Amino acid sequence: MHKKTLLATLILGLLAGQAVAAPYLPLASDHRNGEVQTASNAWLEVDLGAFEHNIQTLKDRLGDKGPKICAIMKADAYGHGIDLLVPSVVKAGIPCIGIASNEEARVAREKGFTGRLMRVRAATPAEVEQALPYKMEELIGSLVSAQGIADIAQRHHTNIPVHIALNSAGMSRNGIDLRLADSKEDALAMLKLKGITPVGIMTHFPVEEKEDVKMGLAQFKLDSQWLLEAGKLDRSKITIHAANSFATLEVPDAYFDMVRPGGLLYGDSIPSYTEYKRVMAFKTQVASVNHYPAGNTVGYDRTFTLKRDSWLANLPLGYSDGYRRALSNKAYVLIQGQKVPVVGKTSMNTIMVDVTDLKGVKPGDEVVLFGRQGEAEVKQADLEEYNGALLADMYTIWGYTNPKKIKR
């Protein structure tokens, strides 16, 4: 996005007396694919074919009579670019998209999605009010937040559809816990508020383990049934949903009316489900190649010492681009289809890799930081081990800090 465009967006927001709710998300027209590879220091390659394959694979698994799908596209479609992927969701006939920010809602609508937009987290009052044009279905899990949303709806002479989040599975994040006596009273009070219309009941599983999911599922069945009966809700107008990616693959009892797959749509799935393809690759190019003698140290704090005369390739990205410092002296990248080690500490804008054992490495050569090159692959499990966290902890940031190129 051009600096002038961003400045104009911020000024308009200030003039309107509104804060910018989330980072601006560019539309596909802003992605100049022909220029990305040669002009950017690093980029993401997004495989639309793989994304559409994953959607169809899931649809085939669920069957025509199975639950509906709500494609979770929060965090800018897990860093993949919601503007790039929404057209595929529309083409596949997916009836619901789950998002977090109003920016994601705006982009989804502008890209032609006319179905249900469900926010998958609690929202601030300002967010709720600013989301009214997008016909958002909000999430509520407390009487206080429900009252706030109802007040906004009444002020604007409208009704806001809401999903009631239950803490049945023990996430203790958004949901109301009906095992507490006063919470049952609060839940019933929510249903009586003018300005909000219950359209869903949901819970979220905190652990990817079958028995834990089944335990939370049993409580959710009790809680949702109590709420339907005590609240005298019309079951035909309520969408009950609980299954995340793990439960969608492993626990069919959690399907109910709708499933909420996130990671699996992008190929971030249980390793044994190899039919789901990775959608993202993270790439850069060699900026320069330098020759250094044995005994030299590399990078800040001298954390790596060369054991031989070495050729080091300078890669023009660092932790400001989402390549974590935790990967220093542990990770590897792919050049010429071969694994080469990261040496020295990751800098703000630079990492160094040892290419001594390769021939003819030169500026402009493609480097794969995550993904495949020839028969070699930078594996998810390896990066997660080096980083000490889920890969999503990194790739969602990659998406915000690097341009995207559609793989043709």
From Swiss-Prot:
Keyword entries, A-Z: Disulfide bond, Isomerase, Periplasm, Pyridoxal phosphate, Signal
Leader peptide range in chain numbering: 1-21
UniProt GO MF annotations: alanine racemase activity; arginine racemase activity; lysine racemase activity; methionine racemase activity; pyridoxal phosphate binding; serine racemase activity
Catalytic-site annotation from UniProt: K74 (proton acceptor), Y300 (proton acceptor)
Residues bound to substrate: R173, M348
Known cofactor(s): pyridoxal 5'-phosphate
Catalytic activity: an L-alpha-amino acid = a D-alpha-amino acid; L-lysine = D-lysine; L-arginine = D-arginine; L-alanine = D-alanine
Protein family membership: Belongs to the alanine racemase family. Bsr subfamily.
Record's function text: Amino-acid racemase able to utilize a broad range of substrates. Reversibly racemizes ten of the 19 natural chiral amino acids known, including both non-beta-branched aliphatic amino acids (Ala, Leu, Met, Ser, Cys, Gln and Asn) and positively charged amino acids (His, Lys and Arg). Is not active on negatively charged (Glu and Asp) or aromatic (Tyr, Trp and Phe) amino acids and displays minimal activity towards beta-branched aliphatic (Ile, Val and Thr) substrates.
Protein name: Broad specificity amino-acid racemase
Keyword Isomerase attached: yes
SS bonds (residue pairs): C70-C96
Positions bearing N6-(pyridoxal phosphate)lysine: K74
SUPFAM superfamilies, sorted: Alanine racemase C-terminal domain-like, PLP-binding barrel
UniProt xrefs under Pfam families: Ala_racemase_C (PF00842), Ala_racemase_N (PF01168)
Compartments it resides in: Periplasm
Subunit and interaction comment: Homodimer.
Any single Gene Ontology cellular-component annotation: cytosol
EC numbers: 5.1.1.10
